[in-house]
Swiss-Prot record:
Pfam families membership: Alpha-amylase, CBM_48, Isoamylase_C
MF terms in GO: isoamylase activity; metal ion binding
Gene encoding the protein: iam
Species name: Pseudomonas amyloderamosa
Oligomer status and interactors: Monomer.
GO annotations of cellular component type: extracellular region
Subcellular location: Secreted
Protein name: Isoamylase
Residues the entry annotates as binding Ca(2+): D154, E255, T256, N258, D285
Database matches in CDD domains: AmyAc_Glg_debranch, E_set_GDE_Isoamylase_N
Catalytic activity: Hydrolysis of (1->6)-alpha-D-glucosidic branch linkages in glycogen, amylopectin and their beta-limit dextrins
Length: 776
């Protein structure tokens, strides 16, 4: 995840006084939090957690926005920090609520105790916006239930773009948010099936990362009313199956701030396209639903999952448990002013990690406040949310944004500069600590076995901001990781020759599964998630068509702030007059071949199959525009690239030798110099060598063919001498990514391979390209 603004400095931390002991780990949602009907649908029970509240009142509404409450009910303590009330449905109807039930909470606590003369917009009872223990209760702010299964609307929306109504502090504390605030929606359990979950081993997957809205928003083959919705995405299951994709990974679909995206047409104003500002961890985002009635988004999401499952495709979700949409304090000099939607107004010190004096928030996310992932109650919410999405919504796996924050062993009330678990202050990644969230998740869920079967696939983005948060290779067994080093080193190999030292040893390690990162922890090649590009950065085409980022351009391709300056991109000499579009396509074919021919689990970005471009924008988080929406009307060159990608993926799926369950042995994989000699230490250690080849002994890995791959990183041609293929066979060309082979048949169909020869045959390979042969 990229953030629009990164805080200039992370804040220190100190001991938090007065925080109660955390309850022990328990079964999934053992506190029965949330709002639920009884079996007869005669009563609704509302249960919410707050360890520090002194009073909580339930407010019921007949609509999600713009109306006053129809009824109120005071909750009672139910033990272990839980507050509860059961309300007869007959009473709710008598109050005038005959359709969907919308609800929220108002809470009082030590910094704002209840006063009998309090009324909405009143300051009665007020002591402080934040007290010495970090409490931030404010009864003028209606609070969204953290366990609500659907949300009525976002805080900012076409009817309200004023975020001040949700703020604390002297200027805003008495502003009542009731009519504006997002409400929870009480749901009757859905009967919509999610189909049968695929049990395929992760090593056999090809993952396709895409945004739900962007997937179909401008797809004219889909009826207009379904474009950009869960329903529309489900209609693309056959498209992904035809491409060869086996798992679709959606950018965040939990309720996020995006209802204001269309308020100012053709502008980036107020836009949050990617969705990394979560407002609730249980609710599917209503904006992505065709059916926006109560229960509609839930059932529609489930139906989408069923459509993908029916096509044999897994459904993964990008989840954001490192921070929330509430962010941190508005400034670093005023601790009193902060946004209050939900968690903060219920139990600030439970849900967020606080700094010295408990007035501010510790932040490794760039958004202002770490979610308090070492706290058991906060962990319960994470686990309960994951269980809901896996069990009720049918999701097969999760990609964890800034997952290093979930390995934080620092906790409010337990950290000092010298504390054993927090030697660096308020953040310390510690995979050996059994109580960190990443290990709690492993205990609570079954990870899919290596050979396939039931379970979840878990993917970490293994970095955050500051401290020891860069943890590529540092996660425990059971976790797979986005391999940013794979991306960087292979981009460097293609685009930085002459600008930096290129290590062919690193390229070889990438091709064979990145054992240097994952083997020592007992993991396997498929735990490396191999990608050249994802949403966070340039597209595949732009990596090979841009000399740097251009984020300041006009709508629809900008402007966007932020973005890295380390892209390792190059336009292949186009701007210098030494390259052409055909060279850019060659480079893109080579990059995608790296991705699909390497040991590991390949991850591609939606649109890479047709060379989608963002015109060099590398941080388009804020563009809900045609630039970010996939298109299905292609040029001839784009159609040719699609055929290349489709056949490349099919080749990977047809050859188990490319999908090893364990690390290649010396007899299974042999590295060769261009001369045909086996690569020795002298060759590996010479940083002037930019060409390498390898042969995989297919029969030893259950494959009917052996495979030979040659990569020439030089700018000029290199002659490769082929090793001996298996007895009785010869080498046949499947693809050569060189310019001469640009067109509809760059990657040939099975059975159409071209005979090259046997041992000692020479092959001239053009600069910066890849050759793929099979034995037959």
């Amino acid at each position: 995840m990229k953030c629009p603004k990164i805080l200039a400095a992370l804040l220190g931390c100190a001991v938090l006084a007065g925080v109660p002991a955390m309850p022990a780990h328990a079964a999934i949602n053992s506190m029965s939090l949330g709002a639920s009907y009884d079996a007869q649908q005669a009563n609704i029970t509302f249960r919410v957690y707050s360890s520090q509240a002194t009073r909580i009142v339930l407010y019921l509404y007949s609509a999600g926005y713009g109306v006053q409450e129809s009824a109120t009910y005071t909750l009672s303590p139910a033990g272990s920090g839980v507050w509860a009330v059961t309300v007869p449905v007959s009473s709710i109807k008598a109050a005038g609520i005959t359709g969907a039930v919308y609800y929220g909470y108002r809470a009082w606590g030590p910094n704002w105790p209840y006063a009998s003369n309090w009324g909405k917009g009143s300051q009665a009872g007020f002591v402080s916006d934040v007290d010495a223990n970090g409490d931030r209760f404010n009864p003028n702010k209606l609070l969204l239930d953290p366990y609500a299964q659907e949300v009525s609307q976002d805080p900012l929306n076409p009817s309200n773009q004023n975020g001040n109504v949700f703020a604390s502090g002297a200027s805003y504390r008495t502003t009542d948010s009731g009519i504006y605030a997002p409400k929870g929606v009480v749901l009757v359990p859905s009967t919509q099936s999610t189909g049968t979950k695929p049990t395929r081993a992760q090593k056999d997957d090809v993952i396709y990362e895409v945004h739900v809205r962007g997937f179909t928003e401008q797809d004219t083959s889909i009826p207009a009313q379904y474009r950009g919705t869960y329903y529309g995405a489900g209609l693309k299951a056959s498209y992904l199956a035809s491409l060869g994709v086996t798992a679709v990974e959606f950018l965040p679909v939990q309720e996020t701030q995006n209802d204001a995206n269309d308020v100012v047409p053709n502008s980036d104003a107020n836009q949050n396209y990617w969705g990394y500002m979560t407002e609730n961890y249980f609710s599917p985002d209503r904006r992505y639903a065709y059916n926006k009635a109560a229960g509609g988004p839930t059932a529609e999401f489930q139906a989408m999952v069923q459509a993908f499952h029916n096509a044999g495709i897994k459904v993964y979700m990008d989840v954001v448990y490192n921070h929330t949409a509430e962010g941190g304090t508005w400034t670093s000099s005023d601790p009193t002013t902060a946004t209050i939607y939900s968690w903060r107004g219920l139990d600030n010190a439970t849900y967020y990690e606080l700094t010295s004096g408990n007035q501010y928030f510790y932040d490794n996310t760039g958004i202002g406040a770490n979610f308090n992932t070492y706290n058991t109650v906060a962990q319960n919410l994470i686990v309960d949310s994951l269980a809901y999405w896996a069990n009720t919504m049918g999701v097969d796996g999760f990609r964890f944004d800034l997952a290093s924050v979930l390995g934080n062993s620092c906790l409010n009330g337990a950290y000092t500069a010298s504390a054993p678990n927090c030697p660096n202050g308020g953040y310390n990644f510690d995979a050996a600590d059994s109580n960190v969230a990443i290990n709690r998740i492993l205990r609570e869920f079954t990870v899919r076995p290596a050979a396939g079967g039931s379970g979840l696939d878990l993917f970490a983005e293994p970095w955050a901001i500051g401290g020891n948060s860069y943890q590529l290779g540092g996660f425990p067994q059971g976790w797979s990781e986005w391999n940013g080093l794979f991306r960087d080193s292979l981009r460097q190999a293609q685009n930085e020759l002459g600008s930096m030292t290129i290590y062919v040893t690193q390229d070889a390690n990438d091709f064979s599964g990145s054992s240097n990162l994952f083997q020592s922890s007992g993991r396997s090649p498929w735990n490396s998630i191999n990608f050249i590009d994802v949403h966070d950065g340039m597209t595949l085409k732009d990596v090979y068509s841009c000399n740097g980022a251009n984020n300041s351009q006009a709508w629809p391709y900008g402007p966007s702030d932020g973005g890295t300056s380390t892209n390792y991109s190059w336009d292949q000499g186009m701007s210098a007059g030494t390259g052409a579009a055909v060279d850019q396509r060659r480079a893109a074919r080579t990059g995608m071949a790296f991705e699909m021919l390497s040991a590991g689990t390949p991850l591609m970005q939606g649109g890479d199959e047709y060379l989608r471009t963002l015109q060099c924008n590398n941080n388009a988080y804020n563009l809900d525009s045609s630039a970010n929406w996939l298109t299905y009307s292609w040029t001839t060159d784009q159609s040719n690239f699609y055929t290349f990608a489709q056949r490349l993926i099919a080749f990977r799926k047809a050859h188990p030798a490319l999908r090893p369950s364990s690390w290649y042995s010396g007899s299974q994989l042999t590295w060769y110099q261009p001369s045909g000699a086996v690569a020795d230490s002298n060759y590996w250690n010479n940083t002037s060598n930019y060409a390498i080849a390898y042969a995989i002994n297919g029969p030893s890995l259950g494959d009917s063919n052996s495979i030979y791959v040659a990569y020439n990183g030089w700018s000029s041609s290199v002659t490769f001498t082929l090793p001996a293929p298996p007895s009785g066979t010869q080498w046949y060309r499947v693809t050569d990514t060189c310019d001469w082979n640009d067109g509809a048949s760059t990657f040939v169909a099975p059975g159409s391979e071209t005979l090259i020869g046997g041992a000692g045959t020479t092959y001239g390979q053009c600069g910066q390209s890849l050759l793929l042969l099979i034995s037959k």
